[in-house]
From Swiss-Prot:
GO biological process: circadian regulation of gene expression; positive regulation of proteasomal ubiquitin-dependent protein catabolic process; protein phosphorylation; regulation of circadian rhythm; Wnt signaling pathway
Key word Nucleotide-binding present: yes
Record-annotated Protein kinase domain positions: 1-81
One GO molecular-function entry: ATP binding
Protein known as: Casein kinase I isoform delta
Known EC number: 2.7.11.1, 2.7.11.26
A Pfam family the protein falls into: Pkinase_fungal
Complexes and interactors: Monomer. Component of the circadian core oscillator, which includes the CRY proteins, CLOCK, or NPAS2, ARTNL/BMAL1 or ARTNL2/BMAL2, CSNK1D and/or CSNK1E, TIMELESS and the PER proteins. Interacts with DNMT1 and MAP1A. Interacts directly with PER1 and PER2 which may lead to their degradation. Interacts with MAPT/TAU, SNAPIN, DBNDD2, AIB1/NCOA3 and ESR1. Interacts with AKAP9/AKAP450; this interaction promotes centrosomal subcellular location. Binds to tubulins in mitotic cells upon DNA damage. Interacts with GJA1. Interacts with FAM83A, FAM83B, FAM83E and FAM83H (via DUF1669).
The reaction(s) this protein catalyses: L-seryl-[protein] + ATP = O-phospho-L-seryl-[protein] + ADP + H(+); L-threonyl-[protein] + ATP = O-phospho-L-threonyl-[protein] + ADP + H(+); L-seryl-[tau protein] + ATP = O-phospho-L-seryl-[tau protein] + ADP + H(+); L-threonyl-[tau protein] + ATP = O-phospho-L-threonyl-[tau protein] + ADP + H(+)
GO cellular component: cytoplasm; nucleus
Species of origin: Oryctolagus cuniculus
């Protein structure tokens, strides 16, 4: 779940650094043994913040890396406003 509260700015000499926190909902996307992609599941409940969730998430499709990029896009639009 990517949303604005997960991005922190450094202080002082590290003021140009962005820290990303809270990987509580992170999951593996490839099987460690076979290196095959783990199939998506459907009929999943919404996880994370609805405002920044991808369209697939709203449709009940399990989140993937693609959905993380879509959510990041929504967060960047939020920061721009």
């Amino acid at each position: 779940x990517i949303f604005p509260d997960n991005f922190l700015m450094g202080l002082g000499k590290k003021g140009n650094l962005v820290y990303i926190i809270d990987f509580g909902l992170a999951k593996k996307y490839r099987d460690a043994r076979t290196h095959q992609h783990i199939p998506y599941r459907e009929n999943k409940n919404l996880t994370g913040t609805a405002r920044y969730a991808s369209i697939n998430t709203h449709l009940g499709i399990e989140q993937s890396r693609r959905d993380d990029l879509e959510s990041l896009g929504y967060v960047l639009m939020y920061f721009n406003l």
